[in-house]
């Protein structure tokens, strides 16, 4: 048997800018207890086109947990027909991104 294989590289590796990650950590610590902030998340083979943005500008990609142990229906992974987000997690992510933007625009991270 013969086969031809064409491999298309669809996404660049997603690597956070260290400075932006440190800034996001400052903001996250204002919103969440330190024990709820994970810095050494296991590497993933998943892909995201956000990597294309990080190739040209400083930025940070975060994971916000959406599982509530008190509600087992929220335990399914994303892109799963049973996925049901704990809407409280949306408040955390909104606060993180809005507070980061405000701090940035107010010059808090200027060195």
Predicted regions: what is each one?
Residues 1-111:
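Metal-dependent amide/peptide-bond hydrolase catalytic core
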